[in-house]
């Protein structure tokens, strides 16, 4: 259900601000978004999986907090990130 390590490394490489960057806000949000999308697919098939639903809500809340932090600190990076991830339609 969680994303594979190879996919995670690909996402990290795409959104990293410098080589070896795994903890920047952009990378964290991108990895969380991929996780959320995977869990969403699982939840459509398994509607009564309440443990996964709780995990999904926790990940969404964490992503929301990270996006709020990024918006507060650097609006330009925030706008670029939500545009590239397809959030906030």
UniProtKB/Swiss-Prot annotation:
This protein's record includes keyword Ribosomal protein: yes
Gene Ontology terms: cellular component: cytosolic small ribosomal subunit
Transmembrane segment boundaries: none
Signal peptide range in chain numbering: none
Top-level lineage group: Bacteria
Pfam family, one: Ribosomal_S15
GO BP terms, alphabetized: translation
Keyword Ribosomal protein listed: yes
Record keywords: Ribonucleoprotein, Ribosomal protein, RNA-binding, rRNA-binding
Molecular function per GO: rRNA binding; structural constituent of ribosome
InterPro entries named in the record: Ribosomal_uS15 (IPR000589), Ribosomal_uS15_bac-type (IPR005290), uS15_NS1_RNA-bd_sf (IPR009068)
Similarity annotation: Belongs to the universal ribosomal protein uS15 family.
Subunit structure: Part of the 30S ribosomal subunit. Forms a bridge to the 50S subunit in the 70S ribosome, contacting the 23S rRNA.
Biological role stated in the UniProt entry: One of the primary rRNA binding proteins, it binds directly to 16S rRNA where it helps nucleate assembly of the platform of the 30S subunit by binding and bridging several RNA helices of the 16S rRNA. Forms an intersubunit bridge (bridge B4) with the 23S rRNA of the 50S subunit in the ribosome.
Protein name according to UniProt: Small ribosomal subunit protein uS15
Protein's organism: Levilactobacillus brevis (strain ATCC 367 / BCRC 12310 / CIP 105137 / JCM 1170 / LMG 11437 / NCIMB 947 / NCTC 947) (Lactobacillus brevis)
């Amino acid at each position: 259900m969680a994303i594979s390590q190879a996919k995670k490394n690909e996402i990290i490489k795409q959104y990293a601000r410098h080589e070896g960057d795994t903890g920047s806000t952009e990378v964290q949000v991108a990895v969380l978004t991929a996780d959320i999308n995977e869990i969403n697919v699982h939840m459509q098939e398994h509607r009564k999986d309440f443990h996964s639903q709780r995990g999904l809500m926790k990940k969404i809340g964490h992503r929301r907090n990270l996006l709020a932090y990024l918006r507060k600190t650097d609006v330009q990076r925030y706008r670029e990130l939500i545009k590239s991830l397809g959030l906030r339609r």
